[in-house]
Amino acid sequence: MSEILPYSDEKMGHYGSDGEVGQISFSCRLQDTSSFFGGNQQKRPPKLGQIGRAKRVVIEDDRIDEVLKGVSDKSPSGV
């Protein structure tokens, strides 16, 4: 996981003249980017015909026949 390190005075960027000195921090950076960039680069994107197609699902429910029968027996209301 990446960390953001706190800044210190020696890592501050100074701008402006000596009379009016402003400071801006530029030392916050990602320390470990290997997991960020190395995630799923080897996996290919799906082909156009495969997008939106679900894999086969097995429903293990003893009441599924009763539920489906009850849904098909009801007439749609308001039609």
UniProtKB/Swiss-Prot annotation:
Family classification: Belongs to the CAMK2N family.
Protein name: Calcium/calmodulin-dependent protein kinase II inhibitor 2
One GO location term (cellular component): cytosol
Cellular location(s): Nucleus; Cytoplasm, Cytosol
GO MF: calcium-dependent protein kinase inhibitor activity; protein kinase binding
Keywords from the UniProt entry: Cytoplasm, Nucleus, Protein kinase inhibitor
Region (Inhibitory domain): 43-69
Function description: Potent and specific cellular inhibitor of CaM-kinase II (CAMK2). Traps Ca(2+)/calmodulin on CAMK2.
Protein origin, superkingdom: Eukaryota
Subcellular location, principal: nucleus
Pfam family name, one: CaM-KIIN
InterPro entries per UniProt: Camk2n
Organism the protein comes from: Xenopus laevis (African clawed frog)
